[in-house]
Amino acid sequence: MDVRALPWLPWLLWLLCRGGGDADSRAPFTPTWPRSREREAAAFRESLNRHRYLNSLFPSENSTAFYGINQFSYLFPEEFKAIYLRSKPSKFPRYSAEVHMSIPNVSLPLRFDWRDKQVVTQVRNQQMCGGCWAFSVVGAVESAYAIKGKPLEDLSVQQVIDCSYNNYGCNGGSTLNALNWLNKMQVKLVKDSEYPFKAQNGLCHYFSGSHSGFSIKGYSAYDFSDQEDEMAKALLTFGPLVVIVDAVSWQDYLGGIIQHHCSSGEANHAVLITGFDKTGSTPYWIVRNSWGSSWGVDGYAHVKMGSNVCGIADSVSSIFV
């Protein structure tokens, strides 16, 4: 169905998005700007204009991304960025097999996705908490243990938000700082059921040393720009990859392959790569987000491989357990 043929439909969708999406998508958050129905309606109108513009570019490109109404359409871009894009960029060393750890020279299949191995947990929703950095790191730990043959468990993101030092909880953080904290302190991540997500900062809850949990043995952190085949080999060898991207245009993403409208060197959002697909004319990374399953492609984004789109290869981490 072409929504352009139904001029009233966008306004109905706005009402649904404004109160809908995932059940927890409107968790408590105190904005620094005044909120009102009038402001949200103005933001929605701006979103419609932005969608038309984005969709008018590169119309002949195969499988290009398409943009439209979703749960973020009632936010102005500056509001969206202030709430959701809170990952702090870090400078990663450029990967070199001669200097750094050697990645096995495995043969790359045309398609691979760790979800097919049943070692990736379900998409979560960070709500109005800028904790993407914690969600991506915890997701990688969950998968690393499952790949080793352990049961797939939802681990506590809230524990990382509350306890990780050199980070700011729901006000933003660094994946590198979180990984350093997990590794240096040999923190045992507990299950989400023991330390559930609250979508806000809280006091760190400590567990005894004898309490069962999931710790890491180490991690790697490299810049794989211009080396995305090596990055894919790391994915196959070590498990899902924690990456930091420029996700400003992801506010409007509905599906297709993201090839434009973002840049390298502007990292602001942490996500988890679970696989890749090279079977079509435009190869792409399969990227798990933390904005709920109603966003994008069932909570995932597809990002073009080979061109460092959105800076996806600039800041890449693997976790070892």
Swiss-Prot record:
Tissue: Expressed in all tissues examined. High levels seen in the ovary, kidney and placenta while low levels seen in thymus and skeletal muscle.
Gene Ontology MF, one: cysteine-type endopeptidase activity
Keywords (A to Z) from UniProt: Disulfide bond, Glycoprotein, Hydrolase, Lysosome, Protease, Signal, Thiol protease, Zymogen
GO cellular component: extracellular space; lysosome
Primary subcellular site in the record, as a coarse category: other
Subcellular location field: Lysosome
EC number(s) on file: 3.4.22.42
The protein's role, per its UniProt record: Proteolytic enzyme possibly involved in normal cellular protein degradation and turnover.
Name of this chain's protein: Cathepsin O
Annotated organism of origin: Homo sapiens
